[in-house]
Amino acid sequence: MFTYYQAENSTAEPALVNAIEQGLRAQHGVVTEDDILMELTKWVEASDNDILSDIYQQTINYVVSGQHPTL
């Protein structure tokens, strides 16, 4: 049996958001929060890996909750 423990201070979400932001900025020049959320949503839907899907979903929650600095 596995027990899930929420990390106090996770660094995965900000790092993933920053990577997505850099990639989208290189492609489009301008990035909004909606752009990042749409990209993460595509990744969740395209992933066959439950662990990655969970990470992407947690990152969506992180962005929506307003924890990420304004773009």
UniProtKB/Swiss-Prot annotation:
GO terms for biological process: positive regulation of bacterial-type flagellum assembly. Disulfide bonds: none annotated. InterPro entries: Biofilm-dep_modulation_Bdm_put. It comes from the Bacteria. Induction: Expression is reduced in biofilms and is repressed by a high salt concentration. Pfam families: BDM. NCBIfam families: PRK11436.1. This is Protein bdm. It comes from Escherichia coli (strain K12). The gene is bdm.
